[in-house]
């Protein structure tokens, strides 16, 4: 599943290439992906201009005209690509925005991705309802004190809690494993057992890993690419997908276990319970 760095990379590519484009038409071969109704979306957005592309956590937000926002979630394997108007349709192409000189195509092998059309004034309530946590930056949004308070009030295991998106936005399986390795925290550690120095290191590790991944264009693992461009973060991963290899920090063998049903990679020496 694309995580925050991959979605941000897609956002930046879309921003460079489609902002300012007028939507001539919208087509769907699998209209059920539009949760708010394809016909309404087609009616409201045809003829409108894409004014910007923003992001909240793993969600892309197409800013179209003044009145509407199109919320896109890539889920497991969704991806966008740009093509010429005469490009042949491919097997897993499901949604298309056509412009005067090209088209933006959304393809999804598993059909899990979604589009939702909401009014501009409903964007904030939309994400408040989903309880998406703060963005992982050093500004006031990702407040370390509030982060610490939430961890200390919970008996949840740290990995599944980070995956919930309520503590901080955008973390998925790959980067949670990387963050916990960097912070030297066992993925099954109960959050109320974390000492203050560990929480501080965890807070900063989340920011460091995700910002580094954004800088490197995300991790191109399995099917991910950002409009055809591959990322480089996969070359920097320390534990994810490294089962049986030596930890770069201590030399111990990286292990893989299941935590809350998710494959989890960690160093048994650096990340002790």
Swiss-Prot record:
Region (DNA-binding) location: 58-76, 162-172
Superkingdom of origin organism: Bacteria
A GO molecular function held by the record: class I DNA-(apurinic or apyrimidinic site) endonuclease activity
Catalytic activity: Hydrolysis of DNA containing ring-opened 7-methylguanine residues, releasing 2,6-diamino-4-hydroxy-5-(N-methyl)formamidopyrimidine; 2'-deoxyribonucleotide-(2'-deoxyribose 5'-phosphate)-2'-deoxyribonucleotide-DNA = a 3'-end 2'-deoxyribonucleotide-(2,3-dehydro-2,3-deoxyribose 5'-phosphate)-DNA + a 5'-end 5'-phospho-2'-deoxyribonucleoside-DNA + H(+)
Keywords, sorted A to Z: DNA damage, DNA repair, DNA-binding, Glycosidase, Hydrolase, Lyase, Metal-binding, Multifunctional enzyme, Zinc, Zinc-finger
E.C. designation(s): 3.2.2.23, 4.2.99.18
This protein's name: Formamidopyrimidine-DNA glycosylase
